[in-house]
Amino acid sequence: YIGWISNKQYELINEKQLKLLEKNPQVYSYDLVEFIENDKHELIAIPLGSNLNALNILKHKYDGNKISGVQDKSKIVSTALRFLNSPYSWGGRTPFGIDCSGFTQMVYKLNGYKLERDSHLQAKQGSPLSFIEESEPGDLAFFDNDEGKIIHVGIIMDNNHIIHASGKVRIDRIDQTGVYNSETKSHTY
């Protein structure tokens, strides 16, 4: 995905600093929104999942919650719930706008797992299951269109529920037919 940032939103680092960043384990913000304070004492808002590795190099301060390393699979659903009701925005990856594969990618990233960006690529990772009854909370569920192309992904929860980004990050029922939206009273995927 091609995007843009304001030239006020980045700082150049040298080769030595880059090597240090690449060597250190990844650390991410774990609050919905928190602030970092730069060396000019300006507050900068950062969303859930922001990479905090450069804080020391840039002499920024951060007092919020952090997460790093590979977490137990049981933590995936609780991480997903942090995004609940975030609005849908194609290409988005923050609580201020997120799409289905950006949602699963960010939830897994916060738990120490790397997923591809698009749902059809994520579907190629891991091991496929034959039946929904074989799934566990934290597993990914993929949905295809009439042509067989993967177009949607969500995270399996307990009791035949799924959390996914469709209009917003929401919880719906899931069965062998697909995702049942209680608002529209129909299967949407």
Regions found by a protein language model. Name each.
Residues S50, G138-D139:
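Structural motif
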Residues Y1-S86:
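Boundary regions of SH3-family modules and the immediately adjacent low-complexity/disordered segments
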Residues L140, I150-H161:
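Catalytic nucleophile-His microenvironment captured as a short glycine-rich beta-strand/loop
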Residues Y88-E136:
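Catalytic cysteine-centered active-site loop
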Residues L12, L18, L129, M157-Y189:
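Aromatic- and glycine-rich peptidoglycan recognition patches
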Residues D146-E147:
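A flexible loop/linker signature enriched in serine peptidases of the S9 family
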Residues L18-E34, M106-Q122, M157:
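Short, basic/aromatic beta-hairpin or loop at an interaction surface
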